Curated annotation (Swiss-Prot):
Record family assignment: Belongs to the PPR family. P subfamily.
Domain of life: Eukaryota
Pfam families in the cross-refs: PPR, PPR_2
Organism: Arabidopsis thaliana (Mouse-ear cress)
Keywords assigned by UniProt, alphabetized: Repeat
Entry protein name: Pentatricopeptide repeat-containing protein At4g19890
């Protein structure tokens, strides 16, 4: 078997190269080579020996001598120090040396030479060296070390993109008697995961069963880690479920990765479910595991659950550290509970064990900036410096963002300059915070100037930058420039999220470009993005304004398919559209459905529907429609309705509602009275004005 892997010219060396056949006889090599250590460190050659044979003998002697001088540790590969130029050894001579050493001096000596050889580029990717070494070890019955050589080959060949070739050889070695082991196959999975070759790893996993290798806990763990790292959350969930079902328990490090990945993708409840399931299987969570869940709950806004998890952690004997406290402080600040966060912050300040770090201060500064308490934010900014903590880019960006939102651009620019003085360059997030606020304050030219400065510093626009620019162009009704930015964004590699697509769809709708908005809507769906309530409301509102009530109703009914619940604005838009088409009965049904859902109709919706009843001379139903409103809301709605009726010269119905208005509020407002007086005068019905004026003057409702 082995001889077939050797070059023909060297096969006879296995027979003619007389090396003592026991490891003890290595002392013989040491003795006979000691006389030559001061010269060329080579064995004396017989007259019949060729130069190649002499070189092989010399190398074998050097390896044996070096091996005896080393302190060997069973758990680690043996290393030898050979005072020998590897370049003078050919590929064929190298495999002859390793085969000869394995045959005559034992597996460990051969393995020493093997590791020495693959340390050189010349032999590192010479596949036959690995195969001959593994085959030689296999012939000695040393399957464990043969697998070790195969794993070494897998790692080294993966470096040059030849993983698949190496895996093929591992599989082929089964024909030579080396059946793939779970450790070797897990090595393949690990390499594939590190390279991001998840589909390849899945294929290898399937091949394991075919080859009779039973996947173990490490196999599943590697697949779970790979899918999570690659962002394939559903696939990771599937592998993790399979792992749990087989009773395999992840280690603490893997558990942290699982919990963090699930929480970052908004699957906090799923993370908690797995956490509980693993505990049921005997998993012992540590401080980092608990902190990962607490952080996820805080980012979700589930502060109460986060503190309940904290209590459970303490019951399990773990004391919260600065990272646990920082997660809670950050969560409290994001919910607007800054004072509660500050009390927790002070607890850290007074602690003898842990002190607030840069991230803790940054979270508190962000909380105060959110509440426009910039003086307190600045106080903490100074305090952290006094404590010997250096603000990082995120700290500066948080404070700059706070000042920009408050309109304090002078201080924001001052902080940006201070960053540079302290060795921190503002990043694109810093500039985004400034240009976003400038655009919202109608200072777009200044924002563009600042953005050009960012580009001159070598920064590049990210997805947020493009979103800000597109939103500004849509606000200016320059849809062409917005689309130009949108195209550039896609070419740069940034994908538009649903929020940005909503901005563009709304802009198209405002300009009554329904074909474009329809195309963009369909594109969004085809890309796997899920339209939101805002998307549908924009489309429905525009179709209603265009008088295309059928398409508006179609989009309204499709909302459920994407899990979108219409709000009062969605209902209001559709009711207005139905009223324009004189479909009052359908509009009334929608109005009742909106009330049943607990939604409060906008005033314009109430007025529109009541007005449609009045147009049909059905003031009684108009009265019934408005009857459930409380007094204040009723008065405001009826005043608006009276003015609308007056503008349409429907004085008779207006007088009826005006009379009802005076019954609830004897002091008519000037605007409504003026509108009614003008309408009566223009319609020649001054008697109505006289009658109502007398009632107002008497204060009679």
């Amino acid at each position: 078997m082995l001889s077939l892997l050797l070059p023909k010219s060297n096969r006879f060396l296995l027979r003619t190269f007389e090396i003592p056949n026991s490891l003890c006889s290595l002392f013989f090599f040491r003795l006979i080579s000691s006389d030559h250590e001061s010269s060329d460190l080579s064995l004396p050659s017989s007259p019949s020996s060729s130069p190649s044979q002499c070189l092989v003998k010399s190398v074998c002697s050097l390896v044996c001598t070096s091996y005896l001088r080393q302190n060997h540790v069973v758990s680690s590969p043996h290393r030898v120090n050979l005072d020998f130029d590897a370049n003078s050894l050919t590929h064929e001579q190298a495999i002859t040396v390793v085969a000869s050493l394995a045959s005559e001096s034992g597996s460990m000596v051969a393995l020493c030479f093997f590791y020495w050889a693959v340390g050189f580029e010349k032999f590192r990717h010479f596949m036959r060296l690995y195969l001959v070494t593994a085959d030689s070890l296999l012939a000695n019955g040393n399957l464990q070390k043969a697998h070790e050589v195969m794993r070494c080959m897998l790692r080294n060949f993966s470096e040059i993109g030849r993983l698949n070739e190496a895996v093929g050889m591992v599989m082929d070695m089964q024909n030579q008697g080396l059946t793939p082991s779970s450790i070797t196959m897990n090595c393949v999975l690990e390499i594939a995961v590190e390279l991001g070759l998840i589909e390849y790893a899945e294929n290898v996993f399937d091949e394991m069963s075919v080859r009779g290798v039973v996947p173990d806990s490490s196999s599943y763990k590697l697949m779970v880690i790979g899918c999570f790292r690659d962002g394939k959350i559903q696939e990771a969930d599937r592998w993790l479920t399979g792992m749990i079902q087989r009773g395999f328990i992840p280690d603490n490090a893997t558990c942290t990765l699982i919990l963090t990945a699930l929480c970052e993708n908004g699957l906090v409840n799923r993370a908690i479910w797995y956490f509980r399931k693993m505990i049921d299987l005997g998993f012992k969570p540590n401080l980092i595991n608990f902190t990962s869940l607490i952080d996820g709950l805080c980012k979700k806004g589930s502060i109460k659950q986060a503190f309940e998890m904290l209590e459970e952690m303490v019951r399990n004997g773990w004391k919260p550290n600065v990272y646990t406290h920082t997660a809670l402080i950050d969560g409290l600040c994001k919910r607007g509970w800054t004072e509660k966060a500050f009390r927790l912050f002070l607890k850290l300040v007074r602690s003898d064990t842990y002190k607030p770090n840069v991230h803790t201060y940054t979270s508190m500064i962000g909380g105060y900036c959110k509440e426009d308490k910039l003086n307190r934010a600045e106080m903490l900014f100074s305090r952290m410096k006094e404590q010997g903590l250096f603000p990082n880019v995120n700290t500066y960006t948080t404070l700059i963002n706070g000042h920009c939102k408050a309109g304090s651009f002078g201080r924001a620019y001052e902080l940006m300059n201070l960053m540079g003085d302290e060795g921190f360059m503002p990043n694109i997030y810093t500039y985004n915070a400034a240009i976003d606020s400038l655009c919202k304050k109608s200072r777009a030219p200044e924002a563009y100037e600042l953005l050009n400065k960012a580009f001159s510093c070598g920064l590049e626009a990210d997805g947020v930058t493009y979103t800000i620019l597109i939103q500004e162009q849509c606000k200016q009704n320059d849809i062409n420039q917005a689309l130009a930015f949108f195209c550039r964004m896609n070419k740069t590699g940034f994908e538009a999220d649903m929020r940005l697509n909503n901005i563009l769809i709304a802009a198209f709708c405002r300009q009554k470009k329904m074909k474009e908005s329809e195309r963009l809507f369909q594109l969004v769906v085809s890309l796997g993005l899920i339209p939101t309530k805002e998307t549908y409301t924009s489309m429905i509102s525009c179709y209603c304004k265009e008088g295309d009530i059928d398409l508006a109703l179609k989009y309204f009914h499709n909302m459920k398919r994407h899990g979108c619940v219409p709000d009062s604005f969605t209902y209001g838009s559709l009711i207005s559209g139905l009223c324009k088409k004189s479909m009052v009965d359908e509009a009334c049904k929608l109005y009742e459905a909106m009330i049943d859902r607990g939604l409060s109709p906008p005033e314009v919706t109430r007025v529109t529907l009541a007005y449609e009843y009045c147009k049909r001379n059905d003031s009684a139903n108009a009265m019934i429609l408005l009857e459930p409103l409380d007094k204040k809301l009723w008065i405001r709605t009826v005043r608006t309705l009276v003015r609308k009726l007056c503008s349409e010269k429907k004085v008779g119905v207006a007088a009826l509602f005006f009379q009802k208005l005076l019954e609830k509020d004897s002091s008519a407002d000037r605007v409504t009275l003026a509108a009614f007086t003008t309408a009566c005068s223009e319609s020649g019905k001054n008697n109505l004005v006289t009658d109502l004026t007398e009632r107002i003057s008497r204060g009679v409702g």
